[in-house]
């Protein structure tokens, strides 16, 4: 199930940069090694790329992570992901780094204060 939450009226939403299907396909294939998205992934990514606030409720293992990882490579700015599971943070950041996305990081309670400061400084 996919639910869209549109807080900003569409007429007032900032214009999303034009991202064509070829760019999306290139990121999917080159960075993530996949040939195609699942239908609901495609729908979620299209909504995000169009600048819509989007909430995706999908089954475990469906590939929700790609729904924010792909747009993060195509849109300007910083992507913030909030997760209650430190192990999941580790897995996702390590997976992104292995794929060459080296600006991925995490902030959580397992880090020493100096590590947090260093990572926050790198984000700025």
Model-based region annotation:
Residues 1-8:
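Long, low-complexity, Ser/Thr- and acidic/proline-rich intrinsically disordered regions
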Residues 39-124:
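Conserved P-loop/Walker A NTP-binding site and adjacent catalytic elements of P-loop NTPases
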Residues 3, 17-22, 29, 67-70, ...:
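Short amphipathic alpha-helical segments, especially helix-boundary/capping motifs
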Residues 8-9, 13-59:
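Conserved pre-motif I regulatory segment
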């Amino acid at each position: 199930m996919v639910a869209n939450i549109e807080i900003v009226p569409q007429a007032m939403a900032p214009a999303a940069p034009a991202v064509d299907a070829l760019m999306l396909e290139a990121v999917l294939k080159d960075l993530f090694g996949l040939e195609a998205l699942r239908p609901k992934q495609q729908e979620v990514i299209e909504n995000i790329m169009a600048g819509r606030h989007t909430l995706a409720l999908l089954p475990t293992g469906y590939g929700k992570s790609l729904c924010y990882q792909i747009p993060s490579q195509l849109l300007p700015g910083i992507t913030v992901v909030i997760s209650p599971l430190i192990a999941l943070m580790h897995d996702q950041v390590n997976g992104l780094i292995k794929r060459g996305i080296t600006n991925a990081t995490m902030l959580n309670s397992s880090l020493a204060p100096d590590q947090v400061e260093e990572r926050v400084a790198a984000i700025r």
